[in-house]
């Protein structure tokens, strides 16, 4: 029997074609599991921070992140309940870094750091996914901060202005109003085309529920995404939460829009990372934090930026929050974040308890780049305000020891008291820029000298109502021109004089 080589070749080719090429997967096995950390062997080519799929003996799939790449094993943090994982379970590489869903379909939703909904409003159907870790945009892609981000709070917009693309730290002890400033800022973005991302890290569920309830009450959830990793969530989820929030914010920035992301708070984020690092047996450093704790926050906050025209003109503003112990801003994490950010808003327990709210310490608070973004109108009226208030606080502490004071000091103290009273503002009542300018202008021109200190808040409320009713055009001119020309000053002087005749 003669074999035809051509026929044989044809049969072999057909057989080869009939085989389905299987997907090549790199697998490993669990050696040890404890406290949410899995030690595995195999996975020789796994990347750092790569997403790994763990298949339990019950058929359940649990995801983890490869954090420690050692010679003979890989240290993996699990993103969920690790109790079903046993020694010998199989692991599979995914060949990708962890990603989160992004886009406008997330607005109004509460999600966990993996982008899974927590609000019971159904699935989020979006086609866009961003990696949670991304290299910050380079210097050539950026432009200087030049547009204000109005918080609606007089004391901040006048004295510690924030620009779009800035990183401004909110720092203070517990219960000093840090989250209140953040939520007021979100509420004030209504109608200003700024998309907000509120990242809750290690907070109590009751506190988070209250914040979400307030955002819904004031219509702020329409343009806000809440990323929540509360105190009961594993440290791994608390660790990735701010990066997920930054990725959601970057989507808006890369699409030429303005976004604001609030990290509440990075003290708990650092504690979660310390917990993970110690469980992975990484060497501890100062205050038991690992050596790369600075890089943890710098790579996160550097992602906030103001892009130039060639890259879409978008911006991502970051307001990280840090909780101090006994007003100690010289501790490790506070000093790290202060050195990374473009300024800080320092809230003081003493001021808060004295009823001065927002409890901003003017002397220790600063905005390094926000002044360039401040409107001309606000710059003109708020010029000497910060100095006056800082000097008043200094004088006030000295006068506790002095019995008799000269007239000039008494006058300065009275002025300082009235300005401090004017800077007070109730929560959930943000003010428009033109209203702030009008009120501060009245103080600068000495019109408050004849008003008793305890009537300042009444004066402000009634004066703004009077302006809206009788001088709406003047307010519109300030808003549109963003300046306070001589003509506007003349109209404001006329308005204040007329109002003082009817003020009671």
UniProtKB/Swiss-Prot annotation:
Amino acids binding ATP: 172-179
CDD domains (alphabetical): ATP-synt_F1_alpha_C (cd18113), ATP-synt_F1_alpha_N (cd18116), F1-ATPase_alpha_CD (cd01132)
Function: Produces ATP from ADP in the presence of a proton gradient across the membrane. The alpha chain is a regulatory subunit.
Membrane topology recorded in Swiss-Prot or TrEMBL: Peripheral membrane protein
Assembly: F-type ATPases have 2 components, CF(1) - the catalytic core - and CF(0) - the membrane proton channel. CF(1) has five subunits: alpha(3), beta(3), gamma(1), delta(1), epsilon(1). CF(0) has three main subunits: a(1), b(2) and c(9-12). The alpha and beta chains form an alternating ring which encloses part of the gamma chain. CF(1) is attached to CF(0) by a central stalk formed by the gamma and epsilon chains, while a peripheral stalk is formed by the delta and b chains.
Record's protein name: ATP synthase subunit alpha
E.C. designation(s): 7.1.2.2
GO molecular function, one term: proton-transporting ATP synthase activity, rotational mechanism
Positions bearing the site annotation: Required for activity: 365
A Pfam family per the record: ATP-synt_ab_N
Gene Ontology cellular component terms for the protein in this record: plasma membrane; proton-transporting ATP synthase complex
Keyword field: ATP synthesis, ATP-binding, Cell inner membrane, Cell membrane, CF(1), Hydrogen ion transport, Ion transport, Membrane, Nucleotide-binding, Translocase, Transport
Family: Belongs to the ATPase alpha/beta chains family.
Organism: Petrotoga mobilis (strain DSM 10674 / SJ95)
Cell compartment(s), UniProt: Cell inner membrane
InterPro entries in alphabetical order: ATP_synth_asu-like_sf, ATP_synth_asu_C, ATP_synth_asu_C_sf, ATP_synth_F1_a_nt-bd_dom, ATP_synth_F1_asu, ATPase_a/bsu_AS, ATPase_F1/V1/A1_a/bsu_N, ATPase_F1/V1/A1_a/bsu_N_sf
Top-rank taxon: Bacteria
Reaction(s) catalysed by this chain's protein: ATP + H2O + 4 H(+)(in) = ADP + phosphate + 5 H(+)(out)
PANTHER family cross-referenced by the UniProt entry: ATP SYNTHASE SUBUNIT ALPHA, MITOCHONDRIAL
Enzyme kind, highest EC tier: translocase
